[in-house]
Amino acid sequence: MTSIEALKEGINHQQGFFDGIRGAKTYHQCWLPKEEPKAVLFVVHGLAEHSGRYLHIVNYFVPLGYAVYTLDHFGHGRSEGTRNFVEQFEDYTGPLKTYFDTVRESQPNIPIFLVGHSMGGLIGARYLMDHQSDFAGAILSGPAIRI
């Protein structure tokens, strides 16, 4: 997974895996500012994308004091699973909840904003139906929903 944009120097990058749906490894990563974050941007990527495609958000917001957390959905990026296929929509929202709980534990008093693009906007909107109180707000960019 590569990105056209390079990560700015001095940004703290962390990454890893957790056990996702049906035992598949789910890749996650975050970028942290030097000081305590003002807020967290929880980025949810779109179809056939991966979390590394959002370095423009990282490079803009992290130097301003915001943390950025994201994961690769099942079957996307570095996460395991059949490429771009899920058995049920909860295969997207389940790992999102698992990762959100980890982020909330590491940033207990910081507002968290969901940022979803395209299919990530749809996933984010569906997640918010059950977990609206998890987030201080949401930004849905071109969500894949019918209005």
Regions found by a protein language model. Give the residues of each.
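N-terminal cap/lid segment of alpha/beta-hydrolase-fold proteins
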Residues: 1-35
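Alpha/beta-hydrolase fold active-site loops
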Residues: 38-41, 111
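Active-site glycine-rich loops that stabilize anionic/oxyanionic intermediates
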Residues: 46-49
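Conserved alpha/beta-hydrolase
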Residues: 53, 58-81
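Alpha/beta-hydrolase active-site loop
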Residues: 86-105
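Alpha/beta-hydrolase fold nucleophile elbow
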Residues: 107-118
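Alpha/beta-hydrolase-fold enzymes
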Residues: 117-147
